Amino acid sequence: MTTFSPREIVSELDRFIVGQKDAKRAVAIALRNRWRRQQLKGPLRDEVAPKNILMIGPTGCGKTEIARRLARLAGAPFLKIEATKFTEVGYVGRDVEQIVRDLVEVGIGLTREEKRKAVKAKAEAAAESRILDALVGPTASQATRESFRKKLRASELDDKEVEIELAPSGSQGLPMFEIPGMPGASMGAINISDMLGKALGGQRGKPRRITVAEAYAPLIAEESDKLVDDDALTREAIREVEDNGIVFLDEIDKICAREGRSGADVSREGVQRDLLPLIEGTTVATKHGPVKTDHILFIASGAFHVSKPSDLLPELQGRLPIRVELQPLTVEDFKQILTATEASLIKQTVALMETEGVTLDFTEDAIDALARVAVEVNGSVENIGARRLQTVLERVIDEISFTATDRSGETVPIDAAYVRDRVEDLAANADLSRFIL
């Protein structure tokens, strides 16, 4: 779990996301509160519940990007999932408890990586020993092994092929048992594939011929797993999920039951009802054991173009107490997105063209023109936020991108006149939807 202060979290998000100070502050405080709760002792620690967040803002303003960047910062089990993937219990499809099962799998993966790092030195030594066995045989003299060990460490044998036996991962080789109509869902607390694997005594790996360089990574992973206690790892992962898990529930506005509509919307309202106990706190059965959701942080987000936040069930609104409104992006914001962020669109485009030997030189007025065209098109067609910049920029460099292979060594200046020549005629057209999607 991250120990960053709220100010440090916001400054990290600022490197990649323009504006939206309120949303950044809200998620930074929520993330820091996870750490603060860990410092409490006694029964008070169990009483402190997470303050779940509802982010409201137009499409393309940064809601999902905040989630993506937060996942890297959190250092905790983090799951981003769309609310539209789920159906009411009783309907064909995935039920919302799958969220917790998926989060547990993420937690186990994170914990396994940490455990592997802790035993990496021992695992590397064991992997080296297995490669030496494959090269010179287990009965070779110590002097021979040491001679080959030196060559191995000097990377002199990397291209040599060896035959090694790798155990299949998980229940590989056995058929997967899924509930019909529920792709990816396991049968509650029982995983039939795992049970059959154990009953059959596991699967022996087939010998494979690969180079020494390719053999290292899978051998180290296999030897690491031998040194890790799976039961202890699972218990630790579940504890980490229960205490520090974060779920980002995107597109929550799409499960609102709209006024005057019926039919399929019944299932939408059912999904909201199913979410209530999950967000409030319940125990979910998974194949790894029961998981409590009392202290899992839920961050929901939606554009709410067609529906309103008040269309959510009142009980669900009450379980998302912190409301954050994200602002539509301005021309200045668009200019910042094009140039100021760490992996800005202009930097990406210039780097891609440099691979062909073509240097793109964007002037200040070109960047201003790109931003203004994007804002105009958003205003006259459909506001898709910052995603519009990608469409406009691709239109501008379309010809250069197509002929770049033949123009190696050239420097291509792109100014406002060049941008207008490529896209301004479209911006002036009232019906742009035929040209820009």
From Swiss-Prot:
GO terms for molecular function: ATP binding; ATP hydrolysis activity; peptidase activity; proteasome-activating activity. GO terms for cellular component: HslUV protease complex. One of its GO terms (biological process) is protein unfolding. Gene3D superfamilies: 1.10.8.60, P-loop containing nucleotide triphosphate hydrolases (3.40.50.300). It comes from the Bacteria. Belongs to the ClpX chaperone family. HslU subfamily. This is ATP-dependent protease ATPase subunit HslU. The gene is hslU.
